[in-house]
């Protein structure tokens, strides 16, 4: 009884969904299972335990409600469209365990088209923790961030996000040496995508 009142108000002013519903405290934890932990592409359903675990962390440490959504699709455009179509239900989107380089494309496009926060945990969560560790290590060793050289062993989503945050924190671009499974990423090396090439050194 009475539910029609907020329905009518939200239809006139969609922002009122934050006042009259759980939207503002509800996050979608979304994966296609293409990069599950260190296990690789095991499919969307296999990612469900990780997504449910993330939902538990949201509730336990931030009292944020969340729903895990596993998308059985590896096409970035299809994933983007799916998330766009359900985004109105949520106050935020947490992308999880989506392989690079698709994860970069998906996150960037969603940030452009949605009016809610979009966060790719594998990139930014890892980068925040790693940069905090770097800052503390530099403080203990009495070194300046602008003088240190850093080797990043790996060139996936997490590694690239870490390197980007290192640069934003003051590490010089030329002082970051990134390696993938084929070795150091350097200028002139063949068969590297646009995302890796941003870290190519002389």
Mark where each language-model region is.
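N-terminal ligand-binding/catalytic initiation module
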Residues: 1-118
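Acidic, His- and aromatic-enriched active-site or binding-groove loops in soluble protein domains
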Residues: 123
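Glycine-rich phosphate/diphosphate-binding loop of Rossmann-like nucleotide-binding domains
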Residues: 37, 42-62, 120, 128-202
């Amino acid at each position: 009884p009475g539910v029609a009142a907020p329905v009518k108000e939200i239809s006139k002013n969609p922002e009122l969904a934050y006042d009259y519903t759980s939207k503002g405290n509800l996050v979608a934890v979304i994966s296609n299972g293409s990069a599950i932990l260190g296990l690789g592409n095991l499919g969307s359903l296999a990612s469900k335990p990780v997504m449910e675990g993330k939902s538990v962390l949201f509730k336990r440490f931030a009292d944020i409600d969340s729903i895990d959504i596993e998308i059985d699709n590896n096409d970035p455009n299809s994933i983007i469209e799916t998330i766009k179509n359900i985004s109105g239900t949520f106050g935020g989107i947490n992308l999880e365990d989506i392989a690079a380089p698709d994860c970069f494309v998906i996150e960037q496009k969603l940030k452009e088209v949605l009016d809610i926060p979009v966060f790719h945990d594998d990139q930014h969560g890892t980068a925040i923790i790693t940069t905090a560790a770097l800052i503390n290590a530099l403080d203990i060793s009495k070194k300046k961030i602008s003088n240190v050289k850093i080797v990043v062993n790996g060139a996936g989503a997490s590694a690239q996000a870490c390197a980007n945050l290192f640069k934003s924190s003051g590490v010089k671009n030329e002082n970051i040496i990134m390696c993938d499974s084929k070795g150091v990423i350097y200028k002139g090396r063949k068969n590297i995508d646009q995302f890796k090439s941003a870290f190519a050194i002389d």
